[in-house]
């Protein structure tokens, strides 16, 4: 039976749903827009500004998760799903997630009017890059154990920040960092945590690169030495940062599922497998390989429905909730398994590292993608942490 799973699981959640006429019209509108505006090839990088302007001109499509009060499109859950699905069907210019998808919801919910007016416009147009200052050497999965200290000055005008963050993604290009700091050690460790916004060009901020297993430089260590942060850069109340961070982590984890990218990546892996001759057929014809593909397609379909339930909760005014841990856990596992399929298809041609490529074009970089993908089940909360969250908050286990 499993040999035929791949041929039976062909539908996405959208094809199972009976879309209302207005949703079908919206889907057509998105498809026409993509056909007319998406840059191709290298233009994806040189014409990024034009792409995002065109999205903005559609009424907030450049910030699809934002509320209409802040310039977002106010999509229904179904429209949001359709939009993500259609945008994920082909490569589109990337938008860094830290400002638009992570910090912005915190500012909208907990920031002052002055902070919203100051930061949201530059977050939206991409002129200012942000990074996330959460993890520390002794506070990764146990994030509430963080030690970076922020002391309020005697006159109450600024915080003096000292400490270290690690695994800080894209800190090397960030203009600002939103940072969890400890302002008090009294009470439970989740208490006394304060959410600060810190400029990266302060002379007391130092960024040191970390080269990952895949050979890339995307994460860093960030050191703070006597950094003065004006009190107006504090988001919300002092000592309430943990509450704000939990909401941000839920948004981050649901976004890390990367469902549409996985759908596109799996289709690419299938095309690659069709190029590999095995006996009288192709690698994709092998029952063992076809079964792996079919299982992934089935799991992706299940994950799509979980995402839709999460979107419906958010649209009703709630947080993503503990189900975001399911999205993060399964979504990142699927991402890793797709890199394994590409590695299997590349075979011995994936072996060269930094040397001149040979063999099929898709083989070059397959090993780097596989190794780099090992981190997906760690960042944003390790899989073990997500399982604990699911056990306690979804299954009700103690």
Question: What residue ranges belong to the model's regions?
Answer:
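Amphipathic, small/basic residue-rich leader segments at the start of a protein or domain
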Residues: 1-97, 108, 118, 122-125, ...
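Glycine-rich phosphate/cofactor-binding loops in nucleotide/flavin-utilizing enzymes
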Residues: 2-10, 78, 82-83, 102, ...
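Glycine-rich beta->alpha junctions and the first turn(s) of the following alpha-helix
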Residues: 17-19, 205-303, 376, 392
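C-terminal helix-coil-helix/basic helical segment that borders enzyme active sites and/or dimer interfaces
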Residues: 39-46, 278, 287, 301-358
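N-terminal glycine-rich flavin-associated loop
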Residues: 95-114, 140
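A short, Trp-centered hydrophobic/proline-enriched beta-strand micro-motif
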Residues: 126-134
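A structural signal for short hydrophobic beta-strand segments in well-ordered beta-sheet cores
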Residues: 148-152
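A short core secondary-structure module
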Residues: 157-208
């Amino acid at each position: 039976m499993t040999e035929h799973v791949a041929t039976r699981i062909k539908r996405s959640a959208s094809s199972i749903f009976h879309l209302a006429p207005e949703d079908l019209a919206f889907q057509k509108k998105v498809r026409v827009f993509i056909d007319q505006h998406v840059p191709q090839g290298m233009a994806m990088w040189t014409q990024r500004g034009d792409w995002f302007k065109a999205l903005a001109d559609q009424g907030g499509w450049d910030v699809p998760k934002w509320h209409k009060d802040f310039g977002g499109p106010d999509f229904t859950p179904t429209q949001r799903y359709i939009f993500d699905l259609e945008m994920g069907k082909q490569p589109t210019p990337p938008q860094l997630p830290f400002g638009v998808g992570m910090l912005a919801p915190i500012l909208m919910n907990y920031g002052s009017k002055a902070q919203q007016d100051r930061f949201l416009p530059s977050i939206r147009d991409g002129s200012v890059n942000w990074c996330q200052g959460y993890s520390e050497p002794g506070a990764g999965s146990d994030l509430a154990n963080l030690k970076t200290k922020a002391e309020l000055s005697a006159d109450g005008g600024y915080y003096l920040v000292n400490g270290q963050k690690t695994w800080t993604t894209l800190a090397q290009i960030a203009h600002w960092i939103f940072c969890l700091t400890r302002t008090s050690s009294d009470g439970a460790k989740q208490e006394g945590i304060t959410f600060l916004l810190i400029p990266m060009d302060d002379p007391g901020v130092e960024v040191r690169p970390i080269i990952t297993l895949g050979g890339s430089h995307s994460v860093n260590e960030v050191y703070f030495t006597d950094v003065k942060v004006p009190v107006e850069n504090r988001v919300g109340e002092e000592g309430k940062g943990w509450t704000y961070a939990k909401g941000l982590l839920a948004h981050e984890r649901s976004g890390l599922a990367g469902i549409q990218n996985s759908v596109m990546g799996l289709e690419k892996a299938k095309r690659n497998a069709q190029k590999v001759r095995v006996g009288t057929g192709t690698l994709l014809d092998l029952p063992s390989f076809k079964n792996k593909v079919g299982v992934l397609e089935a799991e992706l379909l299940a994950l799509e429905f979980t995402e839709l339930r999460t979107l419906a909760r958010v649209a009703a005014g709630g947080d993503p909730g503990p189900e975001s841990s399911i999205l993060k856990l399964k979504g990142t596992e699927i991402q890793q398994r797709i890199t394994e399929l590409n590695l299997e298809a590349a075979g011995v041609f994936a072996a060269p590292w930094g040397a001149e490529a040979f063999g099929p074009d898709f083989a070059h970089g397959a090993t780097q993608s596989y190794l780099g993908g090992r981190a997906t089940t760690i960042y944003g909360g390790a899989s073990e942490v997500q399982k604990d969250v699911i056990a306690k908050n979804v299954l009700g286990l103690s």
